[in-house]
Amino acid sequence: MTAATEQKEKTGTDNVGRVVRVTGPVVDVEFPRGSVPELFNALHAEISYKDLAKTLTLEVAQHLGDSLVRCISMQPTDGLVRGVDVTDTGASISVPVGEGVKGHVFNALGACLDDPGYGKDFEKWSIHRKPPAFDELEPRTEMLETGLKVVDLLTPYVRGGKIALFGGAGVGKTVLIQEMINRIARNFGGTSVFAGVGERTREGNDLWVELADANVLKDTALVFGQMDEPPGTRMRVALSALTMAEYFRDEKQQDVLLFIDNIFRFTQAGSEVSTLLGRMPSAVGYQPTLADEMGELQERITSTRGRSITSMQAVYVPADDYTDPAPATTFAHLDATTELSRSVFSKGIFPAVDPLASSSTILDPSVVGDEHYRVAQEVIRILQRYKDLQDIIAILGIDELAEEDKQLVQRARRIERFLSQNMMAAEQFTGQPGSTVPLKETIEAFDKLSKGDFDHLPEQAFFLIGGLEDLQRKAESLGAKMEDTSGDGAPAQSDSKSDSKGDDADKDA
């Protein structure tokens, strides 16, 4: 039996072409006249390489004319030669959906990686789908409470919205995504889908182990197309994960959390594919279709009536340049942005969120309420004034400031440190359990802090703690130690002349 005959039995189609050119992951295939497959159709080629037989999946990317199609391979093309038969499946790439995908790891083609052969009999959906119709969208806006003080107070997340974590290399994007998976799964239940797009394979394995240890793997589906995969796979893996999430939203009427790490790699893979297809590059070398490709993905991530897909996306910022077309294009689709800053990270404040650079569309009295909005704006005002004064402090010293500004600087430094928090995802590194602070307590604590109710407490007491009880406990501990050494019973005060001194004290604490 020939390979073409076997493929005909598998796919039910006799539309068979042959390979005429192979250039890396780009494959040109010639079909009989009048039988050219449609764009995005999946093609299969049976190849043998070093005594190993495998099925190669290609996706039609261009029609070249004269019955020729140009395809992108989803796997390495080692062993693929001219003349090999290629069969049109008559459909696009599809992935398994349903309750059975939870607790397992899949690749972009829907093959189970942790249990080969698992899921072959599941219902399958095409990864290329249209977004919900406008009249099906959910008109209400609701906040998603996370238990992280800096997020809930200053950049509240939208249930059913799109949230991005911006930052350069090594500032904690993946750790924060792992933290959110833990928090959402433990506090709210529901289903999570994780898409690993072009990131480190080691991180994918670590995530798998951590989710299993936290007992949340049973409610999570993972789809990986990591950095060792061809660009075609890295470009499609986000769509595969989104398709699984859409099933839970549309068929099971569930609220779903979709995590994408990293959306920049999706753009990067699209750029590689565009170059391989011979398209003229656009700004900074990116593909001319960047906005369309991003829109096709982001428009499907939305809330329909009574159910939602809430997406959290890590966005790598090349060279910390926010004007780069990749992060700039992502901005247009977002409901909330959380910027992770290297300067905040260097102070040892985790999560390293820059509160002045982060934003949310629902930080509005009509959504979060008057009290939440008022407290958030006062905290932002204090932090912004502190930032404005830092040049003067660096040149002249804090003693040259007016008394009012001195007091504001002291208060701002306490606010900065109180925005830090121990995280569940980092327990194995810090040895400290993660903390969750209810929104009401967060608002109350920062209201008191911004009014000066805690000005007498040492700065170190605010560092890497949870709510008000933790603050009182740590302040009493530090106060007792400092009284014993000073002997005069004076309230504990910290030296604020230098940021570096305060930061060193925080780290020691």
UniProtKB/Swiss-Prot annotation:
The gene is atpD. It is found in: Cell membrane. Residues 496-509 have a biased composition (Basic and acidic residues). This is ATP synthase subunit beta. Produces ATP from ADP in the presence of a proton gradient across the membrane. The catalytic sites are hosted primarily by the beta subunits. It comes from Mycobacterium sp. (strain KMS). It comes from the Bacteria. Belongs to the ATPase alpha/beta chains family. It is an enzyme of class 7 (translocase). SUPFAM superfamilies: C-terminal domain of alpha and beta subunits of F1 ATP synthase, N-terminal domain of alpha and beta subunits of F1 ATP synthase, P-loop containing nucleoside triphosphate hydrolases. Its main location: membrane. F-type ATPases have 2 components, CF(1) - the catalytic core - and CF(0) - the membrane proton channel. CF(1) has five subunits: alpha(3), beta(3), gamma(1), delta(1), epsilon(1). CF(0) has three main subunits: a(1), b(2) and c(9-12). The alpha and beta chains form an alternating ring which encloses part of the gamma chain. CF(1) is attached to CF(0) by a central stalk formed by the gamma and epsilon chains, while a peripheral stalk is formed by the delta and b chains. NCBIfam families: atpD.
